Amino acid sequence: MGHHVGNASTSQAWTEHCNDLIRRVCDLFPTNFVPVCQLPQSPQTPIGTSITELRRCVEEMGFIGCNLNPDPSGGYWKDLPLGDKYWYSLYETMCDLDVPAMIHVSGACHPAMHTTSSFYLGADTTAFVHFMMSDVFTDFPSIKFIIPHGGGAVPYHWGRFRGMAQDMGLGDLNERVLGNIFFDTCVYHQDGIDMLTKVIPTENILFASEMIGAVRGIDPRSGHYYDDTKRYIDATPNLDDAQRKMVFEGNARRVFSRFPL
């Protein structure tokens, strides 16, 4: 994505080219890929161009979802929280088109943040808190968001967030967020997947792995790639066969309702 590079015009042109290429790849390999688009975001700019591009991708090219960057500045967090009404016209369009958004930042520019560790996982956690403390899911009850990397720190600290929601008078956390937020399985050790599948309901977990990801090496303890997440899901004692099928396939088909059957 690279939303921190250039200006709004740069992002617009780059995004359109990237989305056209995504459509081309999906046409070349229709049994391997379905298209999800990036949006032409740029720090502190109107969200209208993202709405136009989302409609182009979904209505004209058959895309089934989008990626939403909560911090186009690359770590300086210049834009408003995801619960702010700045985002509402985009959320309205997502609901109108019935497409989910993956919440995912791009490269880190802030010298205190490493892109694929502190920035990614911190942004995942921050996005969750934005939604938890806002009225987004009340105002848009059908909206769907996927938080990657197993939700950042969220499942590990579910008790903290439950307690905060309770103290703030927000009600039961599960009821407040789990109708709209889903977590992927880009978690690179067995204990992490075990914890995710124990804390988060199966209905809210979507399978994910990497093509070129944050960790590319082989774990010397297991002899397998760190990001071979299917192995962890197959091995966890917290799922039966029916639940594994939900994680591997069923949940994604439900969340990405435009997925071609």
Regions found by a protein language model. Give the residues of each.
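Active-site gating/metal-coordination segments in enzymes
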Residues: M1-A127
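Generic hydrophobic alpha-helical segments
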Residues: S50-L54, M133, I193
